[in-house]
């Protein structure tokens, strides 16, 4: 193998890392489960809901891989927040500001690791309204990642309070089974 191929490969990796800096990767990490939940909501329900389970599993695994990539490109020598996205919201009073630091990346990895395990183990625990359960799980994943990434107090509060709704539904409907 010629060393020039190794150089090309590493320059390709550096190109990916350089081009990802302008991409809103944290917003993608937050919105991907919501898009999956909307897709499951608008699909026709089959008799066994297996297609919904596979879609939810695919979305959650894609989110886990995205968080692994985020952990890979995370610079552990920087103490400050990284991948910060700041959008003005509500006439400058409230900003949609998200970013990650060393602790929040670990919580994001934990969240995106546990959700596919929950979706895989859903056959043994959930017997009714599986489609609604999967939508609630994906929405709760969105809200938890939003809580761990938020840098604005109002955005944190909105993600935290919105995360209580699917959690309440999961505990209330499927908690006694």
Give residue spans per PLM region:
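Juxtamembrane/membrane-water interface recognition
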Residues: 11-14, 41, 174
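Alpha-helical transmembrane segments and their immediate interhelical/interface regions
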Residues: 21-42, 150-167
